[in-house]
UniProtKB/Swiss-Prot annotation:
High-level lineage: Eukaryota, Metazoa, Chordata, Craniata, Vertebrata
Subcellular location per the Swiss-Prot or TrEMBL entry: Cytoplasm
A GO CC term attached to the entry: cytoplasm
Major enzyme class: hydrolase
Organism: Pongo abelii
Protein's recorded name: Cysteine protease ATG4A
Keywords per UniProt: Autophagy, Cytoplasm, Hydrolase, Lipid metabolism, Protease, Protein transport, Thiol protease, Transport, Ubl conjugation pathway
Catalytic activity: [protein]-C-terminal L-amino acid-glycyl-phosphatidylethanolamide + H2O = [protein]-C-terminal L-amino acid-glycine + a 1,2-diacyl-sn-glycero-3-phosphoethanolamine
Function: Cysteine protease that plays a key role in autophagy by mediating both proteolytic activation and delipidation of ATG8 family proteins. The protease activity is required for proteolytic activation of ATG8 family proteins: cleaves the C-terminal amino acid of ATG8 proteins to reveal a C-terminal glycine. Exposure of the glycine at the C-terminus is essential for ATG8 proteins conjugation to phosphatidylethanolamine (PE) and insertion to membranes, which is necessary for autophagy. Preferred substrate is GABARAPL2 followed by MAP1LC3A and GABARAP.
Length: 398
């Protein structure tokens, strides 16, 4: 069995070694909210792309759950894409969108700490072990392929155990983002303001929340906003193409999870009608923390030109990601959505102020009352019963 798996892994590596060069064109390339003029800024573009953390299949890590697989080749691609999206959010949170990575250059301590969150060990908060085991609570067996919505739900639940990054993760439902719910989840009350009377009134609108309300709240919990969508039945509906591309132009953009059936990619931008993506389908050997307490990061950055895909070849089941470090970033995102997304006759998703009356009441997610750490908590899948099962709505074409 091991020899068969090794052969399969090597085959994946060979298939992904070929990366087409970019054409010589005057068109703009958009990468996670930043634009590059391809003809004159190609090296700057490739440097921007290589700074993104790149997570791929790995092998020879400790068996998941003690007796499970020691490689995620063939099934973990969407989990790796989810890791890449989340890692980009953490980069923006601690280092900023304009931070750049250089090979063999000493990096900030925050960078190393971010990287260690994703190592393939059960004690790392966003490891393949944690994600696969949390997926059991979403109805996915360990070793089963995940869809975009399932990965989003897994990240939302794992983030509850991550005190260092302290993210609020909001996953939209029914193609609808609710401003009121996000504000309720992300606002952190001033120290000592623990009574209901100290909470900001729910009636505040998106327009006046950005100004004149700072007295109500001293802090904003950084927001990872994930919007799972289905943009067609068996293939993407062309009516959504322009709105989908607009999302990559937003400064809050974290790209998109998607791809083709059973083949997930992390989409980070576009050139014309081609989506630019990082491909996790390369199998590399597990990397652990070194004796000096740091991680050798050379295999966590893609140093070749990334691949491209015509947007109409994209499977319609996707998940958009956005990061809003401050409340003003979220207010700006709402304005951009109103201007660029909601103007369409057939809207990609809805943005509403109030919580829909026919929905169950919104309860901000909270860490379950357990005495163990997050890593230990999901080491026992029986304890996943404390989480509600989220419906995995995506229906991938076959």
């Amino acid at each position: 069995m091991e020899s068969v798996l090794s052969k399969y892994e090597n085959q994946i590596t060979i298939f992904t070694d070929y990366l087409e060069e970019y054409p010589d064109t005057d068109e703009l390339v958009w990468i996670l909210g930043k634009q590059h003029l391809l003809k004159t800024e190609k090296s700057k573009l490739l440097s921007d792309i290589s700074a993104r953390l790149w997570f791929t299949y790995r092998r020879k890590f400790s068996p998941i759950g003690g007796t499970g697989p020691s490689s995620d080749a063939g099934w973990g691609c969407m989990l790796r894409c989810g890791q890449m999206m989340l890692a980009q959010a953490l980069i923006c949170r601690h280092l900023g969108r304009d931070w750049s990575w250089e090979k063999q250059k000493e990096q900030p301590k925050e960078y190393q700490r971010i990287l260690q969150c994703f190592l393939d060990r059960k004690d790392c908060c966003y490891s393949i072990h944690q994600m696969a085991q949390m997926g059991v609570g979403e109805g996915k067996s360990i070793g089963e392929w995940f869809g975009p919505n399932t990965v989003a739900q897994v990240l939302k639940k794992l983030a509850l155990f991550d005190e260092w990054n302290s993210l609020a993760v909001y996953v939209s439902m029914d193609n609808t983002v609710v401003i009121e719910d996000i504000k309720k989840m992300c606002r952190v009350l001033p120290l000592g303001a623990d009574t209901a009377g100290d909470r900001p009134p729910d009636s505040l609108t998106a327009s006046n929340l950005s100004k004149g309300t700072s007295a109500y709240c001293s802090a904003w919990k950084p927001l990872l906003l994930i919007v799972p969508l289905r943009l067609g039945i068996n293939q993407i509906n062309p009516v959504y193409v322009d709105a989908f591309k607009e999302c990559f132009k937003m400064p809050q953009s974290l790209g998109a999870l998607g791809g083709k059936p059973n083949n997930a990619y992390y989409f980070i931008g576009f050139l014309g009608d081609e989506l630019i993506f990082l491909d996790p389908h390369t199998t590399q050997t597990f990397v652990d923390t070194g004796e000096n307490g740091t991680v050798n990061d050379q295999t966590f950055h893609c140093l070749q030109s990334p691949q491209r895909m015509n947007i109409l070849n994209l499977d319609p089941s996707v998940a958009l990601g956005f990061f809003c470090k401050e409340e003003k970033d979220f207010d700006n995102w709402c304005s951009l959505v109103q201007k660029e997304i909601l103007k369409e006759n057939l809207r990609m998703f809805e943005l509403v102020q109030k919580h829909p009356s026919h929905w169950p009441p919104f309860v901000p997610p909270a860490k379950p009352e357990v005495t163990t750490t997050g890593a230990e908590f999901i080491d026992s899948t029986e304890q996943l019963e404390e989480f509600d099962l989220e419906e995995d709505f995506e229906i991938l074409s076959v």
